[in-house]
Amino acid sequence: MKVFFAVLIALFVCSMVIGIHGGVPINVKCRGSRDCLDPCKKAGMRFGKCINSKCHCTP
């Protein structure tokens, strides 16, 4: 049972790392993540967040 939980946690951490690095920065300035929703949808991505005053979009 301990091995199962260890594998489950490892898969969860790996999926988070892949999700974080899957972001694509676009050349749109933002002040908050809410400003990135429409530009990211226009770029074909579902999610967006504001990092260092630039929008980063993820599928």
UniProtKB/Swiss-Prot annotation:
GO-annotated cellular components: extracellular region
Gene Ontology MF terms in the entry: ion channel inhibitor activity; potassium channel regulator activity; toxin activity
Cell compartments where the protein resides: Secreted
UniProtKB keywords: Disulfide bond, Ion channel impairing toxin, Neurotoxin, Potassium channel impairing toxin, Secreted, Signal, Toxin, Voltage-gated potassium channel impairing toxin
Residues spanning the signal sequence: 1-22
Keyword presence, Chaperone: no
Pfam families: Toxin_2 (PF00451)
Tissue specificity of this protein: Expressed by the venom gland.
Xref: InterPro entries: Scorpion_toxin-like_sf (IPR036574), Scorpion_toxinS_K_inh (IPR001947)
Top-level taxon: Eukaryota
Disulfide linkage: 30-50, 36-55, 40-57
Broad class of the protein's primary localization: secreted
Domain notes: Has the structural arrangement of an alpha-helix connected to antiparallel beta-sheets by disulfide bonds (CS-alpha/beta).
Family the UniProt entry places it in: Belongs to the short scorpion toxin superfamily. Potassium channel inhibitor family. Alpha-KTx 03 subfamily.
Record function comment: Inhibits insect potassium channel. Is at least a 100-fold more potent against the Drosophila Shaker channel than towards its mammalian homologs Kv1.1/KCNA1 and Kv1.3/KCNA3.
Other remarks in the entry: Negative results: does not affect mammalian potassium channels (Kv2.1/KCNB1, Kir1.1/KCNJ1, Kv3.4/KCNC4, Kv4.2/KCND2, Kv7.1/KCNQ1, Kv7.2/KCNQ2, Kv7.3/KCNQ3 and Kv11.1/KCNH2). Also weakly inhibits Kv11.1/KCNH2/ERG1, Kv1.2/KCNA2 and Nav1.7/SCN9A channels.
The protein, known as: Potassium channel toxin alpha-KTx 3.10
